[in-house]
Amino acid sequence: MFAKLYRGLTYVTNKILSTLLSHHSIHYCINSFKPTTLAIIILLHPCCRCNVYIIRCIHH
């Protein structure tokens, strides 16, 4: 039950983030994040620092 809810939440979060940032690498990038990092990014939204995390991830 919790796993299904978590997957659903992750999917929705990915959709929102990819829509907001609309970058081709974003989906792969978000999936490579640890849940804690993802949580930090969500907390920072819609802060421009979020974009820095994404860019670092893409260029990593």
Curated annotation (Swiss-Prot):
Superkingdom field: Eukaryota
UniProt protein name: Uncharacterized protein YOL164W-A
Organism: Saccharomyces cerevisiae (strain ATCC 204508 / S288c) (Baker's yeast)
